Amino acid sequence: MINGGENMLRFIEYPKCSTCRKAKAELERLGLEFEAVDIVNETPSKEEILTWIENSDLSLKSFFNTSGFKYRELGLKDKLSGLSIEEAADLLAADGMLIKRPILEKDGKILQIGYRTEYATLDL
């Protein structure tokens, strides 16, 4: 793991999350250089989140940690379909724990959200 510039993979994580730790270990095992970003201490900005949403074909729901306490506390299951992209980005930028993780990102484009598919299959 290193801090890098352009064309660098960014691994956005919650370090206490076991899934994030497993995904990070795979990146290290693959020998890939990446910048690790703590989603709580360095929550992505609204602008960054909007870029992700606009540059992906993922559903808005894909960006939310639907199993998290904050998601349930805010009742987002019933509200999400009525939110605009701007409103969703505001919510996500306000609390990193609402964001699905880990996120593997490069040049403002999401390569993968979550860790259901091993990174080795992504042709990184």
Predicted regions and their residues:
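Local sequence-structure signature of Cys/Sec-based thiol-disulfide redox active-site neighborhoods
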Residues: 5-30, 34-39
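Thiol/selenol-based redox catalytic cores and closely related redox-interacting motifs
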Residues: 41-124
